[in-house]
Amino acid sequence: RVKPHTSFRGRYESGLMKMMAIGLGKQHGAENIHHQSPGIMHELVEEYGRAVMENCPILGGIAIVENAYDETYLVKGLSPEEIITEEPKLRDLSYETIAHLLFDECDVLVVDKIGKNFSGDGMDPNISGRFVQPQYCSGGIDAEKVVILDLSDETHGNAQGIGLAEVTTRRLFNKMKLEMTYPTGVTNTFLHLMKIPMIMDNDREALQLALCCCPDAEDQTNMKMIRIPNTAHIDVIEISEGMLPLAKANPNIEILSEPYELAFDENGNLF
C-alpha cells in the first residue's frame, strides 16, 4: 500500500521503497533504520531501498492506493526503475484519496477501537492528529483530548498507540498484553506509544473525564466532541451538538439524524 506515513514525510513514505528498506529486512532492517535519527528516516528509506534493488533480484512491485472508504482505488505494477520514478507520484495521489475528518479541530476525539489492523500506530495520526513525532509530521484533526475505548480483536492485545491518548478504559487495559505491545516499541524506539493513560472504569466515565478537562474549549457548556469507530472507517461518525453548525455549513457532510443521547448500557459502556 502506498500511503502517507505516520512518522515522517518524504518522496517515499509507506510503500514499495519502504517495504524493501524495512519489510524485507524484517526486524533487523527495522531496527537498523529506527535506531538512527528520526529526522533522516525519509532519506534512509530511499537509500536502503535503492541498495536492495541494486544488490537483490527485485522483479518489481505491486503498488496499491486506497480511497477514503478503505477500499482499493488503484493497483499498478511497477518495475524496479518505475518504483524510483512512479512511487512518488502515487504517494502524492494517496494524499488526495485517503480519508479525512472534515473538521479542523474538536475538544474531544473518541476512538472506539485501535489496533495494528487499522494502523501501524494503532490509530492513524493522519486522522487523529496524534503523531509519534509531531516535529516531523503534521495533519489530521486538532483534538485537545483523545479517548480510546477498546482494542480490536485482530490486534491480539497489542496496544501500540495507547500512549497517544489521555484517557482509556479498564476494558482496554485488561485486554492489553505487554508481551505483544512492547516488542514493537523496542524495535521502533517510540516508547511513548506504549505509555498507559488515565484508566476509567467504563466508557461513560472516560468521556466525562475528557470533557471536564478541556480548558481550551471555546464553550464549556456546549463541547465539541467527535466519536469514530476507528481511524480506518470514518465515513459515518458521531458528533456532539456543539459541532452541528459546522457540519451543516459543510456541503461534503450529510446529517443522518436528529440529535440523540449516547446509549450507555447498564455497565456504562457504549458497546
Summary of predicted features, one role per range:
Residues 2-115:
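Conserved, well-structured core segments that form the ligand-binding/active-site neighborhood
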Residues 31-34, 74-77, 123-125, 160-163, ...:
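Surface-exposed beta-strand edges and their flanking turn/coil or helix-capping segments
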Residues 64, 80-81, 124-127, 148:
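Elongated scaffolding segments in large macromolecular assemblies
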Residues 112-113, 128-130:
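Hydrophobic alpha-helical signal-anchor/transmembrane segments
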Residues 119:
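Hard-cation-handling environments
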Residues 129-271:
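C-terminal non-catalytic interaction/assembly regions of soluble proteins
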